[in-house]
Design a protein with these regions (language model features):
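The conserved Walker
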Residues: 31
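Post-Walker A helix-loop "phosphate-sensing" segment adjacent to the P-loop in P-loop NTPases
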Residues: 44-53
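A glycine- and Lys/Arg-enriched "phosphate-lid" helix/loop adjacent to the NTP-binding pocket
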Residues: 111-164
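Hydrophobic positions on the alpha1 helix immediately C-terminal to the Walker A/P-loop
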Residues: 38
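NTP-dependent small-molecule kinase module
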Residues: 20, 45, 155-207
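Conserved nucleotide-sensing/catalytic segment adjacent to the nucleotide-binding pocket
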Residues: 53-55, 60-106
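Hydrophobic anchor at the beta1->P-loop junction of P-loop NTPases
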Residues: 27
Length: 207
């Protein structure tokens, strides 16, 4: 598998099968809901590039490209979504339109707040314990000392939950997604069926 340093693109091991459908899937949802985990699985099952907007944004020492150089952030995202087949996850209003304009499918992970909070706390705890580098080449890790920061994923997920839910409900009705297939997943137990349906579409099979 070919990768780039601080890679926001993960390329498939092999070209798509003859007869398979080229898909561009946008995975949306609030912080900590599990977008990246799902997006990686979908990229593998549909043989598509994986685009992680957080990996494009966060530079070394937690410097945000989307804030420091919005034009460059936009350019990099545009270059990524110009590809023929991808799965993209992330919440960045400044590039939302260029992602959604190319999306053939949208998956909204709309779980209940307790589910999301459990997931984001568990994830942050594990990251802080292991000191795992979040994106290769950045040196960025999570620390317990940052848990009370306003921008930390735990606080961010809690503070923005209601606002994000309303935004996404409105977004799915937007004209830019009129031709896209949309999936709203309200419980983790329903996710397998959505993944199966998308994999079948990729393979050109009937659901």
């Amino acid at each position: 598998m070919r990768k780039q340093a601080n890679s926001h693109l993960d390329y498939p091991r092999a070209p798509c099968k003859t007869g398979s459908i080229r898909m561009r899937i946008a995975v949306i949802g609030t912080s900590g809901v599990g977008k990246s985990t799902l997006a990686r699985r979908l990229a593998a099952s549909t043989q598509a590039a994986y685009i992680e907007l957080d990996a494009i944004n966060w530079q070394a020492e937690w410097k945000p490209l989307a804030t420091d150089d919005p034009a460059e952030f936009y350019r990099r995202v545009q270059a990524a979504v110009d590809g023929p087949s991808w799965v993209c996850d992330g919440n960045y209003p400044g590039v939302r339109d260029i992602v959604l304009a190319r999306a053939t499918h949208v998956v909204w992970l709309d779980y209940a707040r307790p589910v999301i909070m459990w997931r984001v706390i568990r994830r942050s705890f594990w990251r802080a314990i292991t000191k795992a580098e979040l994106w290769p080449g950045t040196g960025n890790t999570e620390a317990f000392s940052a848990w009370l920061d306003k921008g930390h994923p735990i606080r961010w997920a809690w503070d923005t939950f209601a606002q994000r839910r309303a935004q996404y409900a409105h977004l799915l009705e937007a004209p830019i997604l009129a031709a896209a297939q949309k999936y709203r997943v309200t419980h983790p137990r329903d996710l397998a069926a959505v993944e199966s349906a998308l994999a079948q579409q990729h393979n050109g099979a009937s659901a």
